[in-house]
């Protein structure tokens, strides 16, 4: 083929996304021309290109193709847009376990004909029929199972000739049977590549086909290598066992041969009895000879020469010798065996010839060589006597040593140790007070070891074996201090100035007194009352809030005839005894007749009531409420409805004090008011605000004694009559007329949304005695559990789900895990606007609204006070109040809160948070 035709073929294949190598293409075209011969003239270029593609599918991609781009296999996220051709290296089904695939590949049906004793044709007809039925059922079950079972996901190993990467089949794109090594696939669309893995589906790839014979692989070997399982382990084990058995047999044969060769020069009997020469066959029997001659006279020639035994002398210097006094166990000297003596005798036989040289005659007889036991005992006795003498003479341990038996005559002096039984070891005695002769035991009455102060009736002591008696633990017990009363340091006390009445000469000067503000629980009021007796002049609680002035430079005295008197403090200590009797009884705070008299006392405001102009000049911070113990005691009684119990303590005339004005001094004005009311019908005493018959009383709810701060007596449907306006003072009418403007419909709806419903079920816990957190006694645990149960804490999610079954709104107690503020604090000019997200264990991020009354109690000021500051351009004070409000709102982030939430049965209404407390305050724990 000419170069022009080859270039045209190369460009045509490139348009088909086959970027072949030019050299491989030329060789491939030459091979095709040689195969076709003369028919090549009738073949078009496109037909030649198709033949080249078929030849490429059966060739290695590394030899024929140039990769269009280098794929970054280490990239985390890549999208391949170009069309690329890859070659399959291997494929694995990752939908099933590799072990299951390996077991299927290695499974084979064993022929058990040898076990049955013949082929299946020899069986009876019944058995053949049964076997056919079972085989057919098994075949049908297998076919059904194979038909139902779907092929799983394939993991394919691919290469583009340079890079090797893996592909995961998301859909059933390829057939597992045709995924042979060397097959080619092409990418047709956008393919995602994640960490070197291509994600393939039907829309982005196609199968081209092909196969390379040289790239075939064994699937069983692939699975076994992946699982690291050696399938030939049993064969290798059998081969190794056979080799070991053959080696052991060869070793045994070699041992037997060696043993046989060694026994050629030995007799089967004892060599001492018979000696046989295997070479010549001669047998020699040695002559029996006695070891020791029995004759009384021994000839010198008949005595064998005994070689001298050389005793090795120690070569180490004396400094390295072991002079320890410990006994080293030694085995007795072994006696030489009899055959050793016999060998010596045989080595030196008796000689009868006189011409032989004679050995030197023995100096003693043989009988004298026998060791006598008596002589040994005598020698040992002498040795012991010498040792004792040496020990008595020496006095230092360093001077004595033990020498061997042959050198006792040269031994040094040895220190003696007296082991007499009469001598006793001296024991160091400690002082008597440091010694406890016996362990802890129960002392008896009259024990001299006890002090005179501790001698008492021992039977009273509670004895424990582990700790001892109570009298030993008295010093460790300390009386717990009562921490319910806290004395405030003077640095935290605010100094205020009270204005005294000019009529009293003693109180004309300004009196510097301290108004103590005490937070937390109150107890021991009597102690505080004794401390407060030093105050010279008692003023009314609210006197220091408002200062009555006639002009800016001088003080004016009120028209009161008598100075105000301090009402008696309610003694809470007496009420603690009988609180249990009145646990379910809640009395109203005051009678209605007293309230009417108080309203009458405010009728004439010209003399006693301070004008609004003078009120503006009063330097008074309404956000700070200062109270004394007296005031807080009465507030606590009013809060829990215990005002009625002090009827036997507080006199009637002292109850008629309203803001420092005595009702008894306004009799004339009451008479004028009564005379003006003569022309009008008198109201009923039972219902003073109505001239109509009394309507029926709404019965209280079942849980009305649990209402807490929201407690009120049973409601009455009271119709307000026209006579009420005459009771209200004129200044209050004026203020009300100016402040109360008729809002529009939208303002009324917003106002109703931000207030509690009139008909609502409330769940509250009864008043309980405050517990001390430092008390760890087990008696308080049941009380805490009971109080926790009385709180009736519910999951917020249950309340929101079950409210569709309610007929009215309910107040539920929830324990949030976290609360987060949605927006900044806002106001519409009347109420506060604040929404928070509440999350507990049952629900997450529920939007709730916080009531205005709760925010007023938390902040200490309301919206109206902020408006007044804004109108007066007091920006700094307004900014300070805003910062204080934001700081106090951080308390919603606490993790120990309890929320009282009003939940409406309507789903479109947001839950309203009415109260918030910590768990310790809710359980009344100090």
UniProtKB/Swiss-Prot annotation:
UniProt note on tissues of expression: Expressed in the germline (at protein level).
GO cellular component: chromosome; nuclear body; nucleoplasm; nucleus; RecQ family helicase-topoisomerase III complex
Location of region: Disordered: 734-755
Gene Ontology process terms (BP): chiasma assembly; DNA replication; double-strand break repair via homologous recombination; larval development; positive regulation of brood size; positive regulation of DNA recombination; positive regulation of embryonic development; positive regulation of reciprocal meiotic recombination
InterPro entries: RMI1_N (IPR049363), RMI1_N_C_sf (IPR042470), RMI1_OB (IPR013894)
SMART domains (alphabetical): DUF1767
Gene Ontology MF terms in the entry: DNA binding
Disulfide bonds: none
Predominant subcellular localization, coarse grouping: nucleus
Subcellular location(s) per record: Nucleus; Chromosome; Nucleus, Nucleoplasm
The keyword Hydrolase appears for this protein: no
Keywords, in A-Z order: Chromosome, DNA damage, DNA repair, DNA replication, DNA-binding, Isopeptide bond, Meiosis, Nucleus, Ubl conjugation
Cross-link (Glycyl lysine isopeptide (Lys-Gly) (interchain with G-Cter in SUMO2)): 428, 654
Family (UniProt): Belongs to the RMI1 family.
Function: Essential component of the RMI complex, a complex that plays an important role in the processing of homologous recombination intermediates to limit DNA crossover formation in cells. Component of the BTR double Holliday Junction dissolution complex, which is involved in homologous recombination during meiotic double strand break repair in the germline. Promotes top-3 binding to double Holliday junctions (DHJ) and hence stimulates top-3-mediated dissolution.
Quaternary structure (record): Component of the RMI complex, containing at least top-3, rmh-1 and rmh-2. Component of the BTR double Holliday Junction dissolution complex composed of at least him-6, top-3, rmh-1 and rmif-2, which is involved in double strand break repair in the germline. Interacts with rmif-2; the interaction is direct and is required for mutual stability and localization at nuclear foci. May interact with him-6; the interaction is required for mutual stability and localization at nuclear foci. May interact with top-3.
PANTHER family: RECQ-MEDIATED GENOME INSTABILITY PROTEIN 1 HOMOLOG, RECQ-MEDIATED GENOME INSTABILITY PROTEIN 1 RMI1
Name of the protein this chain belongs to: RecQ-mediated genome instability protein 1 homolog
């Amino acid at each position: 083929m000419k170069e022009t035709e080859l270039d045209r073929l190369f460009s045509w294949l490139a348009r088909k996304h086959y970027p072949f190598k030019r050299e491989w293409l030329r060789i491939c075209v030459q091979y095709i021309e040689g195969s076709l011969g003369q028919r090549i003239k009738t073949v078009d270029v496109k037909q030649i290109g198709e033949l080249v593609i078929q030849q490429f599918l059966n060739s290695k991609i590394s030899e024929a193709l140039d990769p269009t781009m280098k794929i970054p296999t280490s990239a985390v996220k890549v999208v391949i847009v170009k069309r690329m051709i890859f070659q399959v290296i291997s494929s694995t089904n990752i939908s099933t376990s590799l072990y299951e695939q390996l077991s299927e590949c290695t499974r084979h049906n064993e022929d058990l004909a040898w076990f049955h004793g013949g082929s299946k044709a020899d069986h009876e007809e019944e058995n053949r029929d049964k076997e056919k039925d079972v085989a057919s059922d098994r075949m049908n079950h297998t076919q059904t199972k194979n038909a139902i079972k779907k092929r799983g996901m394939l993991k394919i190993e691919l290469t583009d000739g340079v890079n090797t990467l893996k592909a995961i089949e998301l859909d059933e794109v390829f057939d597992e049977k045709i995924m042979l090594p060397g097959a080619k696939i092409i990418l047709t669309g956008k393919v995602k590549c994640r960490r070197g893995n291509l994600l393939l589906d039907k829309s982005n790839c196609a199968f081209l086909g092909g196969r390379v014979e040289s790239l075939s692989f064994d699937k069983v070997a692939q699975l076994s290598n992946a699982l690291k399982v050696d399938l030939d382990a049993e064969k290798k084990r059998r081969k190794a066992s056979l080799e070991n058995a053959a080696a052991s047999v060869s070793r045994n044969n070699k041992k037997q041969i060696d043993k046989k060769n060694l026994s050629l020069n030995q007799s089967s009997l004892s060599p001492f009895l018979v000696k046989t020469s295997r070479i010549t066959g001669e047998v020699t029997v040695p002559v029996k000879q006695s070891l020791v001659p029995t004759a009384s006279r021994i000839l010198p020639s008949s005595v064998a020469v005994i070689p001298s035994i050389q005793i090795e002398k120690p070569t180490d210097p004396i400094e390295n010798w072991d002079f320890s006094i410990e006994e080293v166990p030694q085995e007795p000297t072994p006696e030489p065996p009899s055959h050793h003596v016999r060998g010596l005798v045989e080595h030196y036989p008796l000689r009868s010839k006189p011409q032989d040289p004679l050995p030197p005659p023995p100096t003693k007889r043989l009988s004298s060589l026998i060791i006598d036991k008596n002589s040994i005992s005598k020698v040992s006795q002498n040795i012991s006597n010498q040792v004792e003498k040496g020990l008595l003479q020496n006095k230092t341990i360093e001077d004595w040593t033990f020498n061997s038996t042959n050198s006792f005559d040269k031994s040094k002096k040895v220190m003696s140790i007296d082991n007499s039984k009469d001598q006793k070891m001296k024991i160091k005695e400690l002082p008597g007070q440091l010694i406890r002769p016996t362990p802890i035991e129960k002392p008896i009455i009259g024990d001299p070891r006890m002090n005179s102060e501790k001698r008492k009736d021992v039977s009273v002591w509670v004895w424990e074996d582990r700790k001892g008696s109570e009298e030993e633990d008295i010093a460790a017990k300390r009386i717990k201090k009562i921490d319910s009363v806290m004395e405030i340091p003077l640095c935290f006390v605010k100094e205020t100035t009270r204005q005294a009445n000019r009529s009293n000469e003693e109180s004309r000067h300004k009196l510097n007194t301290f108004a103590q503000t005490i937070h937390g629980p109150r107890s021991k009021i009597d102690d505080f009352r004794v401390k407060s007796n030093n105050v010279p002049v008692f003023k009314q609680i609210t006197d220091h809030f408002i200062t009555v002035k006639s002009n800016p430079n001088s003080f004016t005295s009120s028209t009161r005839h008598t100075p105000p008197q301090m009402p008696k403090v309610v003694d809470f200590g007496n009420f603690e005894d009988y609180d249990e009797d009145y646990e379910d009884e809640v009395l109203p705070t005051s009678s209605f007749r007293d309230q009417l008299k108080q309203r009458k006392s405010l009728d004439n405001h010209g003399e006693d009531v301070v004008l609004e102009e003078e009120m503006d000049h009063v330097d008074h911070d309404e956000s700070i409420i200062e109270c004394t113990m007296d005031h807080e005691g009465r507030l606590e009684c009013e809060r829990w409805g215990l005002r009625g119990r002090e009827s036997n303590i507080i006199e009637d005339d002292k109850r008629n004090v309203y803001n420092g004005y005595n009702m008894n001094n306004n009799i004339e004005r009451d008479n004028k008011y009564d005379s003006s009311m003569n022309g009008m019908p008198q109201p009923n005493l039972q219902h003073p605000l109505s001239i109509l018959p009394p309507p029926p009383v709404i019965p209280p709810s079942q849980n009305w004694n649990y209402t807490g701060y929201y407690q009120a007596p049973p409601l009455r449907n009271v119709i307000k009559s026209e006579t009420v306006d005459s009771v209200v003072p004129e200044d209050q009418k004026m203020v009300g007329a100016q402040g109360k403007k008729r809002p529009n419909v939208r303002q009324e709806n917003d106002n109703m949304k931000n207030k509690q419903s009139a008909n609502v079920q409330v769940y509250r816990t009864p008043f309980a005695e405050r517990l001390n957190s430092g008390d760890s006694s087990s008696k308080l645990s049941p009380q805490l559990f009971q109080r926790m149960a009385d709180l009736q804490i519910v999951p917020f999610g249950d309340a929101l789900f079950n409210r569709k079954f309610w007929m009215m709104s309910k107040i539920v107690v929830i324990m949030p895990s976290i609360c987060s503020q949605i927006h900044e604090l806002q106001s519409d000019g009347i109420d506060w606007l604040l929404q928070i997200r509440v999350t507990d264990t049952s629900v997450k991020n529920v939007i709730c609204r916080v009531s205005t009354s709760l925010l007023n109690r938390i902040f200490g000021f309301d919206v109206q006070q902020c408006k007044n500051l804004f109108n007066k351009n007091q920006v700094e004070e307004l900014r300070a109040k805003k910062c204080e409000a934001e700081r106090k709102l951080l308390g919603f982030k606490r993790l120990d809160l309890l929320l009282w939430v009003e939940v409406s049965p309507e789903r479109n209404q947001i839950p309203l948070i009415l109260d918030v407390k910590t768990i310790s305050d809710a359980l009344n724990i100090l």
